[in-house]
Amino acid sequence: MLEWLNPVKGFGVTFHTMFKKVPTVEYPEVKAPTMPRFHGRHQLNRWPDGLEKCIGCELCAWACPADAIYVEAGDNTEEERYSPGERYGRVYQINYLRCILCGLCVEACPTRALTMTNEYELADDSRESLIYTKEQLLAPLQQGMEAPPHPMRLGETEKDYYRLGRDDNAAARADEQNSEAVQ
């Protein structure tokens, strides 16, 4: 009946939105902030004394659905210690040509050595530069940290490192409860 008015209604919607504020961001000049839980580039973390948290267990590589992570473990010695445990990640690479930034590797890491930053600008001109090595992924040394290799500074055994930040009384109570449950 009044079908000839349909194009006019469509133009009404167009004119109505023409005068609204544009939500477009001028990206290279103005960067929108990311959400706190955004999955961006990976980072290999360190203990407060500078030793690496990665123990070279390769669980992150096994959990990766895109097969983007390559880990090769090395043995720690008392002369050259890179992490508190027996082993460390001697070779660590993430291929960002394959990585889908899903975060499954972070969930698989038993020592919380691997986290994801908010950095999302990973584009580059060459394929070789998108394969990040351990040196590129390691968190920078903060004040008070010493570059590895060096002896353990935060305790005598690796258990001392893994108990950092935990309530020692709670750990002792848990040990007592476990021993009582076994008996």
Swiss-Prot record:
Region of interest: Disordered: 143-183
- Give the source species: Thermobifida fusca (strain YX)
Q: Specify the protein name.
A: NADH-quinone oxidoreductase subunit I
The protein's location, in the record's own words, is: Cell membrane
- Give the cofactor binding note: Binds 2 [4Fe-4S] clusters per subunit.
Gene3D superfamilies for the chain: 3.30.70.3270
**E.C. no:** 7.1.1.-
- Taxonomy, superkingdom: Bacteria
- Matches recorded under PANTHER family: NADH DEHYDROGENASE [UBIQUINONE] IRON-SULFUR PROTEIN 8, MITOCHONDRIAL, NADH DEHYDROGENASE UBIQUINONE IRON-SULFUR PROTEIN 8, MITOCHONDRIAL
Protein purpose: NDH-1 shuttles electrons from NADH, via FMN and iron-sulfur (Fe-S) centers, to quinones in the respiratory chain. The immediate electron acceptor for the enzyme in this species is believed to be ubiquinone. Couples the redox reaction to proton translocation (for every two electrons transferred, four hydrogen ions are translocated across the cytoplasmic membrane), and thus conserves the redox energy in a proton gradient.
Residue span(s) of domain 4Fe-4S ferredoxin-type: 44-74, 90-119
Q: Where is the composition biased (Basic and acidic residues)?
A: 153-176
| Xref: SUPFAM superfamilies | 4Fe-4S ferredoxins
Top-rank EC class of the record's enzyme: translocase
User: What Gene Ontology molecular-function terms does this entry list?
Assistant: 4 iron, 4 sulfur cluster binding; iron ion binding; NADH:ubiquinone reductase (non-electrogenic) activity; quinone binding
